[in-house]
């Protein structure tokens, strides 16, 4: 089944599946398996083996391998959104909100290399999949960045000529590239530690003169 078709059905299929430790274990096994073998090379049987369950058990929770990938994306994005909203809930200062969002973004990926590989590499091999979700969960995430930029403009902190939506995508793109470089690098270093440098460079360009 094509990924875009599964994406349209993912909300129903995931919500119908019983939650619990076994489902979580299967998702964790899918993350590790997709990262190690590559999504297209991995089989449901590989995921089942990594989770310590029978292949048929996977289908009790997920409709297909595609549904597993969609579920990884949705759960991780929802957790990321919730964490980001909580992190900036008590921060009125727009620049500090951007800094907190950037740190959280890189900290989440930096704490789980296999999840980062799935997000930065495996999910992006399907254009249809990315098109399906670019206007939903990802849009909501970008909205947090956009709102901080717009608030900064209203307070006279950021340049008035900046388009908040485009500027939010620029900052997200910079963080995204840092995550990809971290995956590909042979050096071991803290991904989160790069957040301040990215935000400082961004703020220097966005600051009202």
Where are these regions (language model features)?
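Amphipathic C-terminal alpha-helical segment
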Residues: 107-111, 147, 151, 171-189, ...
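Amphipathic alpha-helical packing segments from all-alpha helical-bundle domains
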Residues: 78-82, 129-155, 165-169, 173, ...
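Hydrophobic alpha-helical connector segments
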Residues: 71, 85-114, 164, 168-171
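Hydrophobic/aromatic residues within well-ordered alpha-helical segments
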Residues: 22, 65, 72, 76, ...
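N-terminal intrinsically disordered/low-complexity leader segments
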Residues: 1-21, 28, 32, 209
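Amphipathic alpha-helical segments used for helix-helix packing
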Residues: 97, 109-129, 181-184
């Amino acid at each position: 089944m094509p990924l875009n078709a599964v994406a349209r059905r993912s909300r129903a299929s995931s919500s119908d599946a019983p939650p619990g430790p076994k489902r979580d274990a299967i998702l964790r096994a899918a993350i590790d398996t997709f990262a190690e073998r590559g999504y297209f090379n991995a089989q449901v049987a590989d995921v089942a083996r990594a989770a310590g369950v029978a292949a048929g058990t996977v289908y009790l929770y997920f409709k297909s391998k595609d549904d597993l990938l969609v579920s990884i994306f949705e759960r991780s994005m929802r957790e990321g959104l919730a964490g980001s909203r909580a992190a900036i809930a008590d921060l009125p200062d727009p620049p500090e909100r951007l800094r907190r969002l950037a740190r959280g973004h890189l900290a989440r990926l930096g704490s789980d290399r296999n999840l980062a590989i799935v997000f930065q590499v495996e999910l992006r091999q399907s254009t249809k999949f990315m098109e399906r979700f670019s206007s939903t969960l990802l849009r909501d995430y970008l909205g947090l960045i956009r709102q901080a930029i717009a608030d900064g403009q209203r307070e006279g902190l950021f340049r008035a000529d900046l388009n908040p939506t485009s500027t939010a995508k620029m900052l997200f793109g910079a963080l995204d590239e840092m995550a990809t470089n971290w995956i590909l690098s042979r050096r071991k270093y803290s991904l989160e530690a790069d957040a301040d440098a990215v935000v400082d460079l961004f703020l220097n360009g966005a600051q009202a003169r």
